[in-house]
Amino acid sequence: MNHENRISELTQEQTEFKRDIGVFGGVSIIGGIMIGSGIFYLGSYVLERTGMNSGLALICWIIAGLISLFGGLCYAELGTAMPKAGGRVIYLNEAFHPVVGFTAGFTDWLIGGPGSIAAVSIALMNVLQSFFDVSAFGVKAGAIVLIVALTVYNLFGVKAASMVQSLSMVAKLVPVIIVMLAALFVGSVSPDLSLESANTYAEANDTSILAMVAMAVVASLWAYEGWTNLNTVAEEIKNPKRNLPLALIIGIGGVTVLYTLFNFAIMKVLPHDEIVSMINNEDLYLGTAVAKKVLGSAGAIVVSAGMVLAMFGTANGMVLAQPRMYYAMAEEGHFFKSFAKLHPKYKVPTV
């Protein structure tokens, strides 16, 4: 295939896939993968790396959100120019060389994809273990059953998978928003958002504010990870030239607002000294502590429900998105041909 034909194929919107994902479905894939259990504890790492300065920690959450949004805008441009399944595999092929795209896709197939899905599934079962008497073997068996069930369900078409993703995202947001709004309205602490203590910390530790921000943003970026997965299913998005960038902007922008407000809500409930004491004692689940304070004994149940739903959405989102990269490698002719086959009825890669 010559270069002109190759570019023409990548830019046209005709496809064998079913374009069943709308804007909300796209937002659900992004939010479903991005918003995980980390919302309840990653704030501790950000605070720790900013010298326990509340104002600087919130700035870092916003900076990480803006970095993710800028990345999302770049992906929106790539996705509208080349609305094909495979995401970064396609982009790396075109920008550099097919070897680079294949290396990224093969690494994800061998380690990154299954490793991430397994880790999230085990973590989900560990949360349930605190409510049910389940052995270590039971946790692993439950995780395997979950992965197999999600995989089988996703074989019945992207419309069904997208619907579950949308429902799970809404369901996971309910407990998170309940905790956040309760904390914002009930919390009586007035957090000190000045940067004075950060300057003092920087001088005492022979560092700089910029270095502290850089380290803290790395921690907060982990919470934003996952937005790249939407482009993997670009070939299944309705009107991708409009809906793909819209879903990326709404999804990443909304998560940025949620993360910033949630961490501010924590500071509204827990006095700064208590936060510092918890982190120093390696009790990192600040969100859980807030839920227990504002909701009483029901707080732990609300948080656990939120964590389970969040991880379920993350697992389903990865099971939905990742096979499209392997499809793209096979379609390029660099991977097993069977991976490029779509189900004759449901039009999803099944191998």
Where are these regions (language model features)?
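Membrane-interface "cap" regions at the ends of multi-pass membrane proteins
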Residues: 1-55, 69, 73, 85
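Inter-helical loop and helix-membrane interface segments of multi-pass membrane transporters/permeases
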Residues: 48-51, 118-146, 151, 188-213, ...
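Hydrophobic transmembrane alpha-helices that form the core helical bundles
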Residues: 45, 69-147, 151-155, 160, ...
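Lipid-exposed faces of alpha-helical membrane segments in multi-pass integral membrane proteins
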Residues: 31, 35, 59, 63-67, ...
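TM-loop-TM module centered on a large, flexible mid-protein loop between adjacent transmembrane helices
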Residues: 90-91, 129-130, 134, 247-316, ...
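Hydrophobic, membrane-embedded alpha-helices of multi-pass small-molecule transporters
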Residues: 21-40, 146-149, 183, 202-265, ...
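Helix-loop-helix connectors at the membrane interface of multi-pass transporters/channels
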Residues: 3-6, 10, 89-101, 121-142, ...
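Membrane-interface loop-to-helix entry segments
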Residues: 125, 138-195, 225, 248-253
